[in-house]
Amino acid sequence: MSKFYKIWMIFDPRRVFVAQGVFLFLLAVMIHLILLSTPSYNWLEISAAKYNRVAVAE
């Protein structure tokens, strides 16, 4: 573990952090789209039904 810093001699830190940021953003988008596609976790329809703005599609 004491020589773990040498990993940055193999990988460019800027590219690693950019790739990590892109991966985390795409993961967050995917999770949100999955949640919006389920009826029990779709906060848009739940909010609309709560305030009687739009009829919820069954």
Swiss-Prot record:
Domain of life assignment: Bacteria
Subunit structure: The core complex is formed by different alpha and beta chains, binding bacteriochlorophyll molecules, and arranged most probably in tetrameric structures disposed around the reaction center. The non-pigmented gamma chains may constitute additional components.
Designated gene of the protein: pufA
UniProt topological domain (Cytoplasmic) ranges: 1-15
Gene3D superfamilies: Light-harvesting complex (4.10.220.20)
Pfam families referenced in this protein's UniProt entry, alphabetically: LHC
Bilayer topology term: Single-pass type II membrane protein
Annotated positions binding a bacteriochlorophyll: H32
Keywords, in A-Z order: Antenna complex, Bacteriochlorophyll, Cell inner membrane, Cell membrane, Chlorophyll, Chromophore, Formylation, Light-harvesting polypeptide, Magnesium, Membrane, Metal-binding, Transmembrane, Transmembrane helix
Topology, Periplasmic side: 37-58
A single GO cellular-component term on record: plasma membrane
Protein name: Light-harvesting protein B-875 alpha chain
Family stated for the protein in its record: Belongs to the antenna complex alpha subunit family.
Keyword Transmembrane belongs to the record: yes
InterPro entries in UniProt: Antenna_a/b, Antenna_alpha, Antenna_alpha_CS, Light-harvesting_complex
Residues recorded as bearing N-formylmethionine in the entry: M1
